[in-house]
């Protein structure tokens, strides 16, 4: 069973990496903020195997992305930010879906994940991530007002939109995937 779990998590990580490459900017937001659907395989991993599997998918896709594409900052600041955002987004599903085992429960848990990702990534970008980018890029530090503007006009709406879009997309495909996910989960438990 451990081999099967390893294979499934590896396959989901590979799919997540490919989905990460198929990103697109959202109109009206800064071009460096791109939406992708790479959190979908991590949600599937969580529903089948639990939180550690979902976190593993988030980690592996970002490591692969850094190895293959690198980072404009030279260090994986963006990948770390993506890992944190993805983990914040998917973790409520790991804990709430077990209690609310339904499509409605899934939507509620993903919307809570959207709220967690939006709020905490806004704070982390203000305090840590955006200052790290400027430091590693050897750019002048952003003023307090520039940081606030970047977060309020870019980061906050981006994470909210991304979470809502992924929630809607996953909720729609969940209807078709639910029997397969339940079959995989019951095979994992037994």
From Swiss-Prot:
GO terms for molecular function: riboflavin transmembrane transporter activity. The chain crosses the membrane at residues 6-26, 40-60, 77-97, 110-130, 155-175. Inhibited by excess of riboflavin or FMN. Also inhibited by protonophores such as CCCP and FCCP or in the absence of glucose. Keywords: Cell membrane, Membrane, Transmembrane, Transmembrane helix, Transport. Its main location: membrane. Residues 1-5, 61-76, 131-154 are extracellular. It is a multi-pass membrane protein. The keyword Phosphoprotein does not apply. The keyword Transmembrane helix applies. It is found in: Cell membrane. Disruption phenotype: Abolishes riboflavin uptake, cell growth less inhibited by roseoflavin. One of its GO terms (cellular component) is plasma membrane. It holds the Pfam family ECF_trnsprt. Residues 27-39, 98-109, 176-190 are cytoplasmic. InterPro entries: ECF_trnsprt_substrate-spec, RibU. Induction: Induced by riboflavin deficiency. One of its GO terms (biological process) is riboflavin transport. Mediates uptake of riboflavin and roseoflavin, a toxic riboflavin analog; may also transport FMN. Probably a riboflavin-binding protein that interacts with the energy-coupling factor (ECF) ABC-transporter complex. Unlike classic ABC transporters this ECF transporter provides the energy necessary to transport a number of different substrates. The substrates themselves are bound by transmembrane, not extracytoplasmic soluble proteins. Belongs to the prokaryotic riboflavin transporter (P-RFT) (TC 2.A.87) family. Forms a stable energy-coupling factor (ECF) transporter complex composed of a membrane-embedded substrate-binding protein (S component), 2 ATP-binding proteins (A component) and 2 transmembrane proteins (T component). May be able to interact with more than 1 S component at a time. This is Riboflavin transporter FmnP. It comes from Bacillus subtilis (strain 168). The gene is fmnP.
């Amino acid at each position: 069973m451990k081999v099967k779990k390893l294979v499934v998590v590896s396959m989901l990580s590979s799919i997540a990496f490919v989905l990460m490459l198929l990103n697109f900017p959202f109109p009206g937001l800064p071009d460096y903020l791109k939406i992708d659907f790479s959190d979908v395989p991590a949600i599937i991993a969580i529903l089948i195997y639990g939180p550690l599997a979902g976190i593993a998918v988030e980690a592996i896709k970002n490591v692969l992305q850094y190895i293959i594409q690198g980072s404009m900052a030279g260090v994986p600041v963006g990948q770390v930010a993506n890992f944190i955002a993805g983990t914040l987004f998917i973790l409520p599903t790991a804990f709430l879906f077990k209690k609310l085992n339904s499509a409605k429960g899934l939507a509620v848990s993903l919307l809570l994940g959207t709220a967690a990702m939006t709020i905490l990534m806004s704070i982390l970008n203000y305090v840590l991530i955006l200052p790290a980018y400027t430091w590693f890029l050897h750019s002048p530090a952003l003023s307090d007002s520039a940081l606030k503007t970047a977060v309020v006009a870019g980061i906050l709406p981006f994470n909210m939109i991304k979470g809502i879009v992924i929630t809607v997309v996953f909720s729609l495909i969940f209807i078709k995937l639910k029997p397969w996910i339940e079959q995989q989960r019951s095979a994992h438990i037994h």
